[in-house]
Amino acid sequence: MFSKDKLANMEVYNDINGDLVNLFRCVKFHCGELQKELSFMLNSREIFYGFVSQYNTRGMTDIQRAARFFMLIKTSYGSDHRSYGCVKRNVNVMTQYLTDIQERLSNVVIENKDFEDLLKVYDKGDSLIYLDPPYYGTERYYQAQFSKEDHVRLCEVLKNVKGKFILSYNDCEFVRGLYKDFNIDEVQRNHNLMGKYKDKDHKYSELIIRNY
């Protein structure tokens, strides 16, 4: 949604993943320093696994941590950031668009909160809330823990929001049952990971759930 033009008077980005939030904050407030840090990095298997081994190392600055996390995102296979992707990527090309992202984030509030705590602060009658929780049944692939109870808790919280919400989920019986009282649309999406490594389209079903 941040790739679209800014239309709202106020925008809030929230993620429970502290490393992702740190990356966004560094792009917003220290973009030049982050790009400089990244300019010394290479796309290689050895460096990738070096960053993996340093993942929880203390003593790094926020910029150093953000640069390593950025490289793990861009050069990994899948979303676990633990397996090298063997994909040809030019680091300088990857970092060029960070300046555009910095400009886009200039007036965005960046938070690192549990969804329930966040909505207590920002849910208003004129709010439009987009939520992208972990797909049900795939939680082990995410760094931030999200349990079955959290999926249920999210649904209960959304039943009482004042604003409008849009929720994207994987298409499964559990999710359809949980949100049966809301508007559910099924859409087809390209499987970007499969398309990246194979010269063919791979599609899967996703649910778009709304309270309006």
Which residues make up each language-model segment?
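Conserved SAM-binding loop of SAM-dependent methyltransferases across substrates and taxa
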Residues: M1-N9
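A short helix-to-beta-strand connector/capping loop
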Residues: N9, E103-V108, K180-F182
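Conserved SAM-binding motif I beta-strand of class I
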Residues: M10-D15
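Short alpha-helix immediately C-terminal to the canonical SAM-binding loop
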Residues: V21
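Conserved SAM-binding loop
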Residues: F24
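Long, positively charged, glycine-interspersed low-complexity recognition regions
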Residues: S147-Y212
